[in-house]
Regions:
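A general structural signal for stabilizing positions within well-ordered secondary structure
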Residues: 11, 55-56, 88
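Loop/turn elements at helix/coil->beta-strand transitions in domains of secreted/extracellular proteins
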Residues: 16-18, 62-63, 92
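Conserved serine/cysteine hydrolase catalytic core
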Residues: 52-61, 78-79, 110
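C-terminal catalytic histidine-bearing segment of alpha/beta-hydrolase fold enzymes
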Residues: 67, 77-84, 88-128
Length: 128
């Protein structure tokens, strides 16, 4: 949603999306394309370019919160850290949250806890 051309594609204000939260994501599909999983996924270069958030960062983007767990697989941590770094490199507002003691599957539970650092960042993003 954050990379959609809302004005060009839908006639809406370019800033219709005011912020975004991404948790424990894969932001570049090239490692999957290069892995044995691609034998059944059939991800080609066009799909990598089209479906990788890291490769779709627009010039204008809403503030983002990128969260990941301390105990996640290294690849998920790397994806999150590199995506957050690339957003900042392009001068986009980005809050990076490394959640102590959590794994990939526990990250979704953080959205149900108003006191979690991830939800606190969400609240700050929307101004409450």
């Amino acid at each position: 949603l954050a990379v959609t051309d809302w004005a060009g594609d839908w006639g809406l204000p370019a800033d219709v999306i005011k912020g975004g939260v991404a948790a424990s994501g894969m932001y570049d599909l090239q490692p999957v394309q290069l892995s044995s999983r691609n034998q059944y996924l059939h991800i080609d270069d066009a799909a990598v370019a089209r479906n990788s958030a890291m490769r779709q960062i627009p010039d204008r983007m809403p503030p983002m919160v990128i969260g990941y767990g301390e105990n996640e697989q290294l690849e998920f941590r790397r994806h999150s850290q590199e995506f957050a770094a690339e957003l900042r490199r392009r001068d986009h507002a980005c809050t990076e949250i490394d959640m102590p003691g959590l794994n990939h599957f526990q990250m979704a539970e953080q959205f149900a806890d108003a006191n979690s650092p991830l939800m606190q960042a969400c609240f700050e993003l929307i101004g409450v």
